Amino acid sequence: MRVRRVVDGEGEQLRALRLRALRDAPEAFGSSAEREAAYAPAVWAERAAGAETVTFVAVDGARWVGMAAGRPDGAVVQVLGMWVDPAARRAGAGRALLDAVAAWAAARGAERLELGVTDRAPAAAALYRAAGFAPTGEERPLPGDPPRVERVLHRSLTIR
């Protein structure tokens, strides 16, 4: 398994992976497979090109088995869309994806990573804690599903 950045021209592969994630864990995301399946090919091409958000994928052979994105927000990089195929879990893909986003963010001068996790994703919360994330104490509405909330976790990228 290796982790690499999604590049321009891989919009269709990114779409297929994202839809798998949304179907596998609809409670973990603020969107739905039905909604995103209707997005135009140009949306996926833009996401793959990484103009605003960078996406990393975990690849096993030729199969994409996981993803995580990073979106800059000042000194913070938001980790978005984190997902690993159930068959590839507990093999290091999740940690490798988080580390790839962290390395990219640190190279951009970011001070920390932030992400949100719902109470319906205890395995994800455990992964984030093991990867050095800690609670901020903040809760925010889950994007796309405002009645639900996600807890905000962060990971420092600076050495003290």
Residues of each region from the PLM?
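Loop/helix-junction capping segments adjacent to catalytic residues or to phosphate/diphosphate-binding pockets
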Residues: 12, 91, 122
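Internal amphipathic alpha-helical segments of the cytochrome P450 catalytic fold
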Residues: 76, 90, 124-125
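Extreme N-terminal starter segment of soluble prokaryotic enzymes
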Residues: 1-3
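Conserved G/P- and acidic residue-centered "switch" motifs that form tight phosphate/ATP-binding loops
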Residues: 92, 109
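C-terminal "cap" of GNAT-fold acetyltransferases
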Residues: 111-114, 118-160
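Acetyl-CoA-dependent GNAT
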Residues: 5-87, 98-100, 104, 108, ...
